[in-house]
Amino acid sequence: MPSMSGITRRRLLASLPAVALARRALGAGSPEGLRHEFIQAGASGPPIRVRTISHFGLAVPDPKRSVDFYQGLFGMPVQARVDTTTILRVGAGPQFISIGPAAANAAPSINHYCLGIENFAVDRVLAALAAHGVTKGDTAGPMKVAVTMRDGTPDLLFGDPDGIVCQLQDVSYCGGSGPLGNVCRTVEPSPKKGLLALRDLSHLTIFSSDAERSNTFYQDLFGLSIRSYQGPTAPTLAIGPTVAFLMFAGGAPARGGATARPASINHACMSLDGFNPEQVLKTLETHGVTPRGDSAGPAGPMKSYVTMRMENRGGAPGGTPELYFTDPDGLLMQLQDSSYCGGSGFLGNVCK
């Protein structure tokens, strides 16, 4: 979710008892017109049945530094290697984070994400994408799809209306070999135990040039239902039977002649069991990720902060704490409880 103003540790500690209090379901105050529009989009059944968030990819100038950082923090084993890309397992897998080199002179980025679908078959997926205006191209540009063969493994990537790259693979995909990319026989243990144990991938928040258009596009293509609302016109789109979701934000015109914010994957969220924001902040600090403090503007690399999502954005009465940190390249990550669904309650786990 888009970040808000930070809070101090003292305020965070004062809010911790709210974990047993905030149990309010979302949706009663949501605009019925918006709700109807989104439900109708998937009423005839999804042409492509999405079940999981499979992975997201980091493109960075120093992949080894990033691999060392994430293994040191989370103890992630190497699930597979593809050329110069290292695939780090999340939890029990097959979900993962891929870390590879950025193009020359390119800024570090979360350069794509992948959704796991049932009964993956390239021809069927291409036909479904074509029916929604996504046509074949040499690369995954806006409304274009490209399939590359990797030693017999098809990797299918397409660009949405903003050119955000989404990959579609089988739910069993591990970044490995075989027709479904689900053969990862040689798993390399992490050289470091890790300080926090990841459970799963929670969500991605994507800055779009037109959030309403993005929501409609993904609803029509995947038949995604509404998981929660983080504001009257800010739905989260449910991914399969899990608590995972996608969220699209943005689309407001730039103010005062400023340049509009380019579309991008703003941040990725990972989940862990027994989420305690104060303890997580302390653990991050032992790994060199220090509190951001009250400084204005974007957080630099290796910083952490907590924001409180209040009732007007679907949070708990006292606020739902949401914890962010930046990695060595300044890429923004979020950590939440494994039950987090983007809803209300102290843990953000109360959804409709």
What are these regions (language model features)?
Residues 84-120, 126-127, 252-253, 262-265:
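Mid-chain, structured segments of secreted extracytoplasmic proteins
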